[in-house]
Structure formats: C-alpha cells, structure tokens
C-alpha cells in the first residue's frame, strides 16, 4: 500500500512520487494551505495540502484531525529557506499532496502522542496509543534486533532452540509461583515457570548438549522499576563445560547483540570475586563507571579511644568500619549537603555518618580527638588524603554497613555527576557463597539449590562457596548462572543442608533426582534478562518502556483490567470456591 516509510525519505528523493500511510500527528491551517505532520512507526514527515495543487486533497485534509488514519500520495520537494526543521529526520523535505484518503477516523485522543508529561497510568491505560510514539517503537525495533542477533550467535555456536513447558510443577526457586488451577484434575494446580531451570538441565541429561531459548518467565514478587511479574530471558545451558566455557559463550553472544544494536563492547569482561565486590563496593553488582572504592580502616579505629568505635573494631568477623574518600569534597559540599548525606544513610540503618575534612593545617572534625597523631597520619596515608578532601566513615554490623555504604557510594556519584551515561562497564562477579542466612536464622541457596558447591564437606554453611557467576552492566545485574550439580548424591546432600527431607525431595524434585541417576553429564548455563538488557541499551527510564504491554508496580494491566474476577461458571468448572476474610 505504501511506497516508503516516512524516514526512508530525504533530500535525495526530491522530485520523486511517493505514497505514504500513517496517522495525523498535528494539523495546521495557514491561510488556506493545510500542513499535516504525518506519523508512522519510523517518524514524522510534513504533508502540504494546497488547493492550487489539488483542490480535492485540500478539501479532504480540512476534515482531518489528530490520530485520523491517512493515505497520502504526492511529490517530494525541499523545504523553503528558513523552514528546515532540524528536529526531524525528514526536516529538509515535505510532500506536496496530490491525493489524500481518510482511511479511518479517531475519537479525541486522551493525550498527545508526543507529550512526555502524560501520567504513566494514563499512558498504560491507552497503551495502544502510547505505542504509536516513534521513540517507543525504536525501543522495540532494537529489541527485535537483539533477539535476532542472539538467535544467530547461539545457533552459530551449535546451540539448539528448544521450547520448555509453561504449565509445570511448583518448585521452590526463591519467589512465589503463579498457580493455574486444573479443570481436569480438580483441586490440583500447575505453576507458571519462574525459569526453565530444571527442564534445561533435563535436556542436558537427554544429551542435547547445547540448548537455548528466549523464554517467558513468571514470578509473583514485589515489583521495582526494573522488575515485572512476567519477563523474558535469554536462557542457555551446555554440557561438558566449565565456568570459563559458559562465560566465553555469554560474552560472545552479548558482543553480537550489542553490535546489532550499534554498540561495540570489549571482551573479555573484568572478573571480581563476590567477597571483594561486597568489601570494596558494598554490592554484589558494583557500578564500575566511577571509583569511590571503600577503604578498610577497622584496624586503625581499633586503636582509637572512642569506646563505640573501639568495641565495633574488636569483632572483625561480624563488624566493619569502611571509609569513602571524596577528592576535594570539602571544597564542594555545603553544610546542608553533609546533613542530607547523614539523613540518607540513616534510612538504611546507619546510626550516623562520621567524617573528617582535610584542611591546610591538617585533619579536622569531631573524630580527630579520639586518635593519636600517629594514628591520624596512618589514616591519612591509608586513605591517600590531600588538602580539600573529605572522608566519610561507616561503622557497625557487617551486613548493615556494607549495604548503606554501598548505597551511599551511588548517592555520592550521582551528587558529584561522576557517572558517564554512555559508558558500558561489564563485570563478572564470581565465587558466590552457596548459602545465605535468612532473618530467622535459617539458610537458603544464594542462587538456587542446583548450583554446584566447591567445598560441600565444609561444616560451616557460610564458608561453602559455589561455582556461580553473575554478569553485571553499569551496576545492574544482567543475568546469572552456575555450573550445576550433576551427581545425585551431591544434590541430595544440598537438599538436606536446606532442610528439605527425603519425602519433600521425592515429591518436588523426584524427576530431577531420577535424571541425575542415569548418567547426567557435567553441565552449566546462564540466563540473561532481555528486558533489563534492552532497558540499558536504549537508556529507558524503566523496564516498562521496553515491554509492549507491561504491568504496573501493583502487577496490574490497566488496559485490559487484569487481573479480574472469574465468572461463577468458570469457578464451578474448576471446582473452586473463594473464602472470605482469609488472613
């Protein structure tokens, strides 16, 4: 029906006849000549409807309004001097219309498509209108390129695309499952998969050797700006591999994806042990686009005559005292800013935020009186302090200090505008602990219970490490993976350490344990979050900008009004009756 998309046209097409299709983005009547900005998925081009060129087209144009669907035929001509619009890709040209058809009319739209100030809830309610914005279209065009590049890259490395079930069995993977009642087997439920984890391991047991899938996953968890109840991941698994093999494959297809999206990245990526990431940056996904690395000063504070700090410093296993040096910070930060910094860290469990300023005549601040001159000199040397610097200190329980100082590091970087928005800093975080302690004192698997432990016979669960790895980009976890347990006895031992008894093992994981009993190969894999990846590549403000029909932060679809009550008939067929006032 059309000859071109709007932005395929430029100054080189002057004099050419074209046929264009799209929507009225804006309409202007300038003394008899009507100008219409015609929008298609690629962008906007200006139509000129002059009665001297076509009286019929001009008359039809006079009836057009915003979001009417038009088909326009005409000739490309250059815009007049001083009329070029540098904001448009087609800003040097316009179309003199000879024939115009109104293909469909539109109700008055609730908002202008290009209006960026529109409330997001209104945009999501009318998502089909919101998606007419060419800026959003560009996100999905890039997403499509990324998926094609991933498929081609993995196929070239010998991976086979296999689809795994959506209706499956509930298994504990860290979040709540979405349950689907069975009509045929009343009182029983399917679960939507949180990941294809167990099925891809079974494919390795089946001898498929290399699998991938662009998989839809579901998790019923509290939402954040970068999370959705349903999301997509690039999921891979491979047999007869070590950690380095999986990392090499992941770097290869990530490089191909970024190339398809017009960005070059350097491989191999940096690697950092989990414990170093936590101790130096307060995060297992550190943003390395800026420095502000922690400095360990607990041994120096142990010598202070401040009772609080000295007591904290006595237990170096459970407690931490960390410093962050800000070069020239004393010359930058106002008193009010320093107060804001303390208010910020208090929100995350800090008792306060101590600091020392470096003046021309030495170190200054309330802390200084608790140290000898020798200790202050050692502190200055350790922190590499110079005149004009300020150094902040966090002290207390290990988990709390690392958390709030890690958050404070990011807060400082934003205050100081240290982050280059165009930089791409990749990092592998490796050697994760196998288990982590919950608030109630119990333990759970840090990644998942199918991860291969390095030292399974260690009696202290917190000392058992795993062959697990996360890939991080600009402080965002893109994905994670591990080498899997491929021996039945090791898998059962891990289950036992997690207090999953034999009966529960058989009920929930019997099929996996069976598969591991029939010659399962060594295997491992990784999953990359496609939505997060595209969010970072496009620079989108949140993950909803790269998902066609996303849910809100309350897990609702405002457009379709999902979730919604089921009919009484549907409930009867499923054998379900809702109880009131369940707590």
From Swiss-Prot:
Binding positions for L-aspartate per the UniProt entry: 173, 219, 447, 484
EC top class named in words: ligase
Keywords: Aminoacyl-tRNA synthetase, ATP-binding, Cytoplasm, Ligase, Nucleotide-binding, Protein biosynthesis
Site annotation Important for tRNA non-discrimination: residues: 30, 82
Catalytic reactions of this protein: tRNA(Asx) + L-aspartate + ATP = L-aspartyl-tRNA(Asx) + AMP + diphosphate
Region (Aspartate): 197-200
GO molecular function: aspartate-tRNA ligase activity; aspartate-tRNA(Asn) ligase activity; ATP binding; nucleic acid binding
Gene Ontology biological-process annotations: aspartyl-tRNA aminoacylation
UniProt EC number: 6.1.1.23
List of residues binding ATP: 219-221, 228, 477, 529-532
Identification of the protein by name: Aspartate--tRNA(Asp/Asn) ligase
Domain of life: Bacteria
One Pfam family cited in the UniProt record for this chain: tRNA_anti-codon
Subunit structure of this chain's protein: Homodimer.
Gene Ontology annotations for the cellular component aspect, listed alphabetically: cytoplasm
Family assignment from sequence similarity: Belongs to the class-II aminoacyl-tRNA synthetase family. Type 1 subfamily.
Function: Aspartyl-tRNA synthetase with relaxed tRNA specificity since it is able to aspartylate not only its cognate tRNA(Asp) but also tRNA(Asn). Reaction proceeds in two steps: L-aspartate is first activated by ATP to form Asp-AMP and then transferred to the acceptor end of tRNA(Asp/Asn).
Annotated NCBIfam families: aspS_bact, PRK00476.1
């Amino acid at each position: 029906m059309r000859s071109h998309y709007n932005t395929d046209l430029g100054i080189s097409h002057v004099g050419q006849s074209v046929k264009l299709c799209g929507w009225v983005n804006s309409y202007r009547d300038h003394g008899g000549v009507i100008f219409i900005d015609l929008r298609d998925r690629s962008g906007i081009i200006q139509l000129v409807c002059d009665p001297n060129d076509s009286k019929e087209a001009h008359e039809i144009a006079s009836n057009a309004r915003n979001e009417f669907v038009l088909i326009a035929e005409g000739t490309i001509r250059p815009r007049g001097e001083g009329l070029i619009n540098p904001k448009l890709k087609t800003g040097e040209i316009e179309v003199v219309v000879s024939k115009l058809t109104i293909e469909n009319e539109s109700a008055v739209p609730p908002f202008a498509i290009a209006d960026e100030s529109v409330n997001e809830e209104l945009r999501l309610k009318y998502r089909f209108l919101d998606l007419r914005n060419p800026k959003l279209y560009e996100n999905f065009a890039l997403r499509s390129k990324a998926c094609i590049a991933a498929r081609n890259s993995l196929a070239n490395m010998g991976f086979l695309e296999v689809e795994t079930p959506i209706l499956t069995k509930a298994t504990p993977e860290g979040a709540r499952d979405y349950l689907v009642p069975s009509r045929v087997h009343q009182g029983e439920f399917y679960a939507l998969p949180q990941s294809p984890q167990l099925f891809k391991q079974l494919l390795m047991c089946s001898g498929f050797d290399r699998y991938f899938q662009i998989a839809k996953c579901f998790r019923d968890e509290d939402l954040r700006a970068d999370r959705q109840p349903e999301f997509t991941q690039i999921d891979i698994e491979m047999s007869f591999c070590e950690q380095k093999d999986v990392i090499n494959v992941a770097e290869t297809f990530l490089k191909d994806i970024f190339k398809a999206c017009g960005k070059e990245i350097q491989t191999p990526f940096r690697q950092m042990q989990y414990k170093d990431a936590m101790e130096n940056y307060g995060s297992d996904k550190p943003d390395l686009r800026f420095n502000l690395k922690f400095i360990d000063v607990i041994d120096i504070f142990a010598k202070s005559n401040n009772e609080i700090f000295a007591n904290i410093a006595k237990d170096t296993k459970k407690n931490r005292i960390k410093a962050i040096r800000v070069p020239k910070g004393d010359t930058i930060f106002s008193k009010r800013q320093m107060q804001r910094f303390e208010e910020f860290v208090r929100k995350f469990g800090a008792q306060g935020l101590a600091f020392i300023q470096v003046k021309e005549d030495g170190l200054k601040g309330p802390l200084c009186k608790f140290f000898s001159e020798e200790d202050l000199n050692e502190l200055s040397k350790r922190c590499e302090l110079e005149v004009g610097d300020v150094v902040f200190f966090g002290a207390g329980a290990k988990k709390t200090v690392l958390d709030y100082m890690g958050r404070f590091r990011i807060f400082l970087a934003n205050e100081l505008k240290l982050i280059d928005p165009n930089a791409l800093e990749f990092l592998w975080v490796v050697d994760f602990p196998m288990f982590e302690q919950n608030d109630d004192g119990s333990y759970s698997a840090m990644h998942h219970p199918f991860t291969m432990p390095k030292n399974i016979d260690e009696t202290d669960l917190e000392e058992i490490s795993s062959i697990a790895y996360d890939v991080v980009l600009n402080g965002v976890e893109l994905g994670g993976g591990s080498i899997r347990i491929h021996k039945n006895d090791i898998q059962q031992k891990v289950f036992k350490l997690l207090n999953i008894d034999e009966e529960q093992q058989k009920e929930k994981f019997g099929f996996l344990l069976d598969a591991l009993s029939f010659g399962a190969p060594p295997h491992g894999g990784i999953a990359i979050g496609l939505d997060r990846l595209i969010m970072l590549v496009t620079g989108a403000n949140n993950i909803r900008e790269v998902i066609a029909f996303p849910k809100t932060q309350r897990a609702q679809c405002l457009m379709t009004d999902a979730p919604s009550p089921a009919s009484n008939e549907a409930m009867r067929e499923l054998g379900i009756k809702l109880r009131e006032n369940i707590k």
